[in-house]
Design a protein with these regions (language model features):
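Short helix N-cap motif at coil->helix boundaries in the Bergerat
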Residues: 44, 125-133
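Short alpha-helical segment of the dimerization/phosphotransfer core of two-component systems
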Residues: 12-17
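Conserved glycine-rich
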Residues: 165-166
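Conserved micro-motifs of the catalytic ATP-binding
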Residues: 32-37, 75-78
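Bergerat-fold ATP-binding/catalytic subdomain of histidine kinases
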Residues: 30, 133-144
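Short helix-loop "hinge" at the ATP-lid/N-box region of the Bergerat-fold HATPase_c
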Residues: 94-95
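Conserved catalytic submotifs in the C-terminal HATPase_c
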Residues: 38-43, 60, 65-74
Length: 189
């Protein structure tokens, strides 16, 4: 009974260490070009719905509103698990850096033959001098000291996007939030 108050903290630290180990392993595999994609036709709309469903409880616990209007199919060629991982990393970051009472909106659209999925938050934003480095390994913004972070999530997401012949774009303003957009080639009909 004495240790009961420590249990949630221990569970949180254990989850963080597990995530760190998984991220380090995947980052090493990506660096050595050893990640194989199980490619097939994927509906980005379904990926968005699945990832938003999996993150909704975490957002609600923090007091953050997660809005994700139903997305159209948005067919792409890729690895569904890895595409989910990209969006999971973007959405988890948005939740971590958005204060209670804030909001996150996930939108998708087609533009110039590309499928775009944007994760926009009302978080702390990223300073202009930090924006070029956010995809670097182990990078932490000056505002990230209070958050558990491996410093690998955005690196992994960007490298996985590149494996899918895509990229992640960033728009951010300090004090107003950030918008990370996954851009992938749209699969032609």
């Amino acid at each position: 009974e004495k240790g009961r108050p420590l249990l949630p903290a221990l569970q949180q630290r254990t989850a963080f260490l597990r995530r760190l180990t998984e991220d380090l392993f995947l980052a090493a595999k990506l660096e050595q070009k050893q990640v194989m994609l199980n490619e097939d036709r994927v509906s980005l709309g379904e990926v968005i719905a699945a990832v938003c469903d999996s993150c909704r409880e975490e957002a609600e616990k923090k007091g953050v509103v997660l809005q994700a209007p139903p997305a159209s199919e948005l067919p792409v060629w890729g690895d569904q698990i890895r595409l989910q991982q990209i969006l999971q990393n973007l959405l988890t970051n948005a939740i971590h850096y958005t204060p209670a009472g804030g909001s996150i909106t996930v939108n998708s659209r087609v533009e110039a033959g590309a499928a775009l999925v944007s994760v926009r938050d009302t978080g702390c934003g990223i300073a202009p001098e930090d924006q070029a480095a956010v995809f670097d390994r182990y990078f932490h913004t000056t505002t990230s000291s209070k958050h558990d972070s491996t410093g690998l999530g955005l690196t992994i997401a960007q490298e996985l996007a590149h494996l899918h012949h895509g990229e992640i774009l960033l728009e951010s303003e300090v004090g107003k939030g950030s918008c990370f957009t996954l851009k992938l080639p749209l699969l032609s009909a």
